[in-house]
Amino acid sequence: LDYYGLMHRTQRLIAIASVVAGLIPFGSAQAVAPAPVTNSDLNAGLMYQILVAEMSAFNGDETNAFSLTLDAARRANSPRLYERAVELALRVRSADFALEAARAWQRGFPSSKDANRYILQILIGTNRLSELTEPLKRELQGLSGKDRVGTINVLPRYFQRVTDKALAAAVLEQALAADLPTTLYGPAAWSAVGVMRIGAGNLPGALEAAQRGAALDANAEEPAVLALNLMDAKAPAAEAIVRKYLTGNALPEIRMGYGRALIGAQRFAAALTQMQLINTQKPDFADAWLVRGSLEIQDKGPAAAEKSLKQYLSLLPAEQDPNDETETGRGAVQAYLLLAQIAELNGKPDEANALLQRIKSPQDALRVTVRRATLMARQGKLDEARAAIRNAPERQADDARTKLATEIQLLRDYKQMSEAYTLLTTAVQTYPDDNT
C-alpha cells in the first residue's frame, strides 16, 4: 500500500471538495490576508458526502458522484454544488441527469442566469425545442433597454445547430410574443424571428418580419440589417426597408453593407454614391475610401481613384520598418495592387514596382510576382521576368501549373513563339489531363 500516495490523493480530493462546496475560492494557491469569518451551511456530514462524491468521480464512477452531489446541493441549497452536479452529468453524457440538476438549481435560485443557460443548452443540444419557450422568456427576465435588445439579438445564435429550423423559428417567435408589438423591443424581436426564418428557408416570412420590425421604427438598425441579408438572398422588396433606414441617421456599417449589395447587383454608380455619402458623413471610415477607389478606376478615372486609395492607406495604422515581415492586411493588399495598376496606366513602371514590393502576403505572393514580371517584360527584361516567375514560391496545389501557364502567356505576348511552343509541350506532358 502506497501510504504517501494515498494521503496525497486524499488531500487533493479534500481540497477539490472544499472548492466545490464553496469553502475555498478558486485559485487560492498562496496565503492571503485573513478574510472575515463566515459560517458555512455545510455540516460535517455534508462535507463527508461531497468528499465521497469527488472520490467517486476521481475513480470513474460519475453516476454515483452525480447522485451524491445533487443530493448535497439540494440539502445545502448551494449553486456551486448544483453546477458541479450538472458538470458530472454532462461528463457521462446524460442529458436527463444534467437537466434534472439544472432544473433543481433553477427551482432553488429562480433568478439564476447560469442555471437557465444550462437548461437552454441541454434542451437545444437534445433537440427538445418545444420545451424552450419558458427558458427563453427567463433569459430576458429582468432585462430592459439596451441589455434586453442585445440579448434578443443574440438569441438566434443559440439555434445554429438545430435540425428543425422552422420549429425553432416558431418557438422563438412564441417566446418573444410580449416584445414583438412594442416600439422599443419589437424591431429587434422581429429581426430575430426573421433571422430564424431565413435559416429555415422561409424568405417571404423573413421579409414580412423585416417589414413589421421596420414599421415599428424605421430608424432601427436590426430590420435594416435583416433586409440587407434578404437583398443578398435576392428578395428585391427588402431594398425599400434599407433605403428608408438610410434616410435617417444611418450607421456607416449598414450603408457600407448596402453599397456592397449594390456592387453585387452590378449597380456600380449607385454604390459609388453610397461610398461618397459615407466619406462625407464619417471621413475616417477607411473601408469606404477603399471601395470608392475601386469603383472610381472604372468610372471617374485613375486620378480620382488614386486620391481615394491613398486616403484609405493614410487611415490605416502607420507602417512599420520596411524590413518588417509583418503580413500586409487584406485591404492594404488590394489598395497597393490598384495603385500599382494606376501607376502602370500612367506610364510609371518603377513606381508600380515599388508599390508591389510593399505587399508582404504569402497568399498573394504569386499574384504579386506575376504583376512584377509583367512590368519587367514591358521594360524589355523578359529573361528577368521569366526567372522571377520560375523562382516564385509555390504555396497552393495549382501554383506550379499557374506559373507555367503564366510564363507561356508572357512568351506569346512578346512573340517568342518557339520558346512558348517548347514550354507548352512540356506543360502538356506534365499535365496531360489539363484541357485549358
What are these regions (language model features)?
Residues Y4-M7, F26, G45:
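A composition/secondary-structure signal for short, hydrophobic, low-basic-content segments
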Residues E62:
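ATP phosphate-binding glycine-rich loop
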